[in-house]
């Protein structure tokens, strides 16, 4: 099942690493493909809900680092659930 969402992801420092609101194009996600903290947030949302969640590193990307997200990062997501297909 896909969830159609707008989301803005940032580090606790405020550095934005993803923003579908700004792009004007929502994204479709399979819940099982998402980090655990994002899954937990979506499971508590209804279509049309808009929320901001703070995800600790243990429920995010963990120890892994990449170019945009250092390991052990707390993540802040602004999420708007647009639909479920």
Label each PLM-derived region with a short phrase.
Residues 1-13:
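A short beta-strand signature
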Residues 11-76, 83-85:
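A beta-strand/beta-hairpin structural motif
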